[in-house]
Amino acid sequence: MSALDNRLFAKMNGIGNEIVVVDLRDQPAPVTPADARAVAAHVPYDQLMLLQPARLPGTEAFVRIYNNDGSESGACGNGMRCVARQMFAGSDKNGLTFETRAGLLNCWRGPADGLYTVDMGEPKFGWQDIPLAEEFRDTRMIELQIGPIDAPVLHTPSVVSMGNPHAIFWVDDVNAYDLGRFGPLLENHPIFPERANITLAHIVDRQHITMRTWERGAGLTKACGSAACATAVAAARLKRTDRTVEMTLPGGQLTIEWRDNDNHVLMTGGAEFEFEGRFDPALFAGALDPTGA
């Protein structure tokens, strides 16, 4: 028996990032990686957002985040906007606080209808915090390349943690590279002991960046909120952009602000409801891991 048997779910998207939201606040039973993979086979998604009972005073829920391969993620900005939309519906609150593996996240109604803002917390730059497999004193750009030594295809990425590891490669044209081919190679590179999200980014001007991302555990996606945050921060660290930028992703636009006063990163964008349904228990009948996970 799965904790997801007969549970209501909402299929949503955050500028094209495919999200499934399930409210399990009345159900403390755990959801397994095998359950998460079974859901992905039935309702394709990039991230599965599970609202579990709150563990800390002042929070609405503990949000557990699964990628579609059954691995867990500490952060998903687009998914949190979808969660915020669901929780704000029928509520007169202007702000909500959630706990995730990456820490506390605050969400607000955005500056216009249909927009939501998520405080993604502080970025981390230390090589052990990202983490990397070896020491780099300066993570603004590290020595890493793919392709021939004398003519690398991609090289010298910036690395950042936004609760999950990110590597950003600066390019002239984000569509000129086969990210579906290079993404999994770089995601699983030995330098990233916990794997990494891989982004190709082009700085248009000081207020605008275009980007594409291969998401750790999900593959090519139309949008990755934490990658947009990491990319904006990395560009500002290199002094190539201002601290507030517009991000163009395949699925749409995000506004990212890296605040001076507290070092927190704010992400603002849309969240769309698509449909809702209920999980058939038969979906999880064979969802067993040989490890028992």
Curated annotation (Swiss-Prot):
The lineage of its organism: Bacteria, Pseudomonadati, Pseudomonadota, Alphaproteobacteria, Hyphomicrobiales. Its main location: cytoplasm. Keywords: Amino-acid biosynthesis, Cytoplasm, Isomerase, Lysine biosynthesis. Pathway: Amino-acid biosynthesis; L-lysine biosynthesis via DAP pathway; DL-2,6-diaminopimelate from LL-2,6-diaminopimelate: step 1/1. The keyword Amino-acid biosynthesis applies. The gene is dapF. It is found in: Cytoplasm. Belongs to the diaminopimelate epimerase family. Catalyzes the stereoinversion of LL-2,6-diaminopimelate (L,L-DAP) to meso-diaminopimelate (meso-DAP), a precursor of L-lysine and an essential component of the bacterial peptidoglycan. The record marks 166, 215 as: Could be important to modulate the pK values of the two catalytic cysteine residues. One of its GO terms (molecular function) is diaminopimelate epimerase activity. This is Diaminopimelate epimerase. GO terms for cellular component: cytosol. The active site is at 76 (proton donor), 224 (proton acceptor). It is an enzyme of class 5 (isomerase). Homodimer. One of its GO terms (biological process) is lysine biosynthetic process via diaminopimelate. InterPro entries: DAP_epimerase_AS, DAP_epimerase_DapF. Substrate binds at residues 17, 47, 67, 77-78, 164, 197, 215-216, 225-226. It catalyses: (2S,6S)-2,6-diaminopimelate = meso-2,6-diaminopimelate.
